[in-house]
Amino acid sequence: MRIADYSVTKAVLERHGFTFKKSFGQNFLTDTNILQKIVDTAEIDDQVNVIEIGPGIGALTEFLAERAAQVMAFEIDHRLVPILADTLRDFDNVTVVNEDILKVDLAQHIQNFKNPNLPIKVVANLPYYITTPILMHLIESGIPFSEFVVMMQKEVADRISAQPNTKAYGSLSIAVQYYMTAKVAFIVPRTVFVPAPNVDSAILKMVRRPEPAVAVEDENFFFKVSKASFTHRRKTLWNNLTGYFGKTEEVKDKLTKALDQAGLSPSVRGEALSLAEFAGLADALKGQGL
């Protein structure tokens, strides 16, 4: 029997008198086939350390611990710590850290792996309400995670992996794809969770690029420009950028020159631009002193 078997999950929750907290976005997966697929997608073996976020009662942790060198699971809900000590008692390669992943000194914790030099993968069922902040926090942390295989709301996975000229494409697609390749591995129906969420989920596989997707003079400025370009999706690049930089004649003049230099029409929309085109635009705007 597995922790994720519905009868086991139910028994564990009843034994510990656990009640779900909506504020933590708790939805426990009760499908062993899907858990197996997640671990297979992440290509976990004994030469990999794993960071898990939100282990719940240990359903995914169990599958990870069977294959990984070590698993470090960050759980914000202190009520789950004794439950995890119970469900994972047979594993000596799991460490549960009762901390908020957004506030913890992750670089310090990683040094506690027996072999901190092994590749580190992030495998997690992320809380829906805080998926994007957690992902961006980890991606921008400077810690060289080799790969992320994470479950999230399908709509968010679609946005992260979206290509130009699609409805889902936006500043989040650019922010992630600058650092990583991103592809939806498979869909997870809402019916396999306790309690069932209101939407379907997706497993997103993201692999770190050896170098960022495009070379830019100023990364922060590049992200600001891409974000500004999507402020109002139906508006043109010109309208969004004048809304961001200002509408003085001086700004308009610089903007005209930068767009010309980047080979872009003022009437194009942000959703039509590739990462390379955003890079060219950001560098041209920077060159004009904007």
Curated annotation (Swiss-Prot):
Its EC number is 2.1.1.182. It comes from the Bacteria. One of its GO terms (molecular function) is 16S rRNA (adenine(1518)-N(6)/adenine(1519)-N(6))-dimethyltransferase activity. Its main location: cytoplasm. GO terms for cellular component: cytosol. GO terms for biological process: rRNA methylation. Pfam families: RrnaAD. Specifically dimethylates two adjacent adenosines (A1518 and A1519) in the loop of a conserved hairpin near the 3'-end of 16S rRNA in the 30S particle. May play a critical role in biogenesis of 30S subunits. The lineage of its organism: Bacteria, Bacillati, Bacillota, Bacilli, Lactobacillales. It is found in: Cytoplasm. Coiled coil: none annotated. It catalyses: adenosine(1518)/adenosine(1519) in 16S rRNA + 4 S-adenosyl-L-methionine = N(6)-dimethyladenosine(1518)/N(6)-dimethyladenosine(1519) in 16S rRNA + 4 S-adenosyl-L-homocysteine + 4 H(+). S-adenosyl-L-methionine binds at residues 27, 29, 54, 75, 100, 125. It comes from Streptococcus pneumoniae (strain ATCC BAA-255 / R6). PROSITE patterns: RRNA_A_DIMETH (PS01131), SAM_RNA_A_N6_MT (PS51689). This is Ribosomal RNA small subunit methyltransferase A. CDD domains: AdoMet_MTases. InterPro entries: KsgA/Erm, rRNA_Ade_diMease-like_C, rRNA_Ade_Mease_Trfase_CS, rRNA_Ade_methylase_Trfase_N, rRNA_adenine_dimethylase, SAM-dependent_MTases_sf. Belongs to the class I-like SAM-binding methyltransferase superfamily. rRNA adenine N(6)-methyltransferase family. RsmA subfamily. Keywords: Cytoplasm, Methyltransferase, RNA-binding, rRNA processing, S-adenosyl-L-methionine, Transferase.
